[in-house]
Amino acid sequence: MLRIIALIIGSLTITNVTAEPLDQYQILNHLDNYGNLYLRNKPYTSLPTGLIVDGNLNIENTAITRLPKGLEVNGSLKGGNSQLSRVPSGVKIKGYADLIGSQITSWPRGVRVGGFINLTDTPLLSLPNGFRVKGDLSVIRTPLTELPNGIVIDGDLYIGGSGITTFPDTMTVKGNIYLGGNTITTWPTSLELGGAVAR
């Protein structure tokens, strides 16, 4: 009898969580007073098209695979350890984009980020030509083998553990370059460096 009561109580406390898209009405359940949308560890698979977030957007540890077209984040984006693999052109993020441990393989042209971009521990393979980062750029422990020619980084560059062994002909790093043990065999003929190189 005691087992049956324990089984009934246990079944009543178990919640059935299934992955689903996030709609405009459910968003209200995850917004705080500052306009931050907090979805960390939530069972959502997608975000609505044209979503505008007044504050920060946190999709860490979610099954969301792509950001919606027309997304505007007036704060920062936190997508660490999520299934995020695609960021469409036209996405605007006023703050930083921290995507450590996500599934990003390429970064398209036309994505605007106002701060650092952290792509550490992602399967990143390519960055667009003329890529500009308004803060630091980290590609630590990625399979990325080359940086695009003409890349401009307003902060520091971190490449330790990546596949990068050569630098493009022209590049600008206004902060420091942290090699993290990588050996660079080809250096730019035109390098604008604001700081130092740390091996």
Predicted features, each with a name:
Residues 2-57, 191-194, 199:
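N-terminal capping/linker segments that flank leucine-rich repeat
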Residues 5-10, 15, 94, 105, ...:
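Residues marking helix boundaries in flexible regions
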Residues 45-47, 65-67, 85-87, 107, ...:
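Canonical leucine-rich repeat
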Residues 57-103:
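Mid-chain, structured segments of secreted extracytoplasmic proteins
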Residues 158-199:
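Leucine-rich solenoid repeat scaffolds
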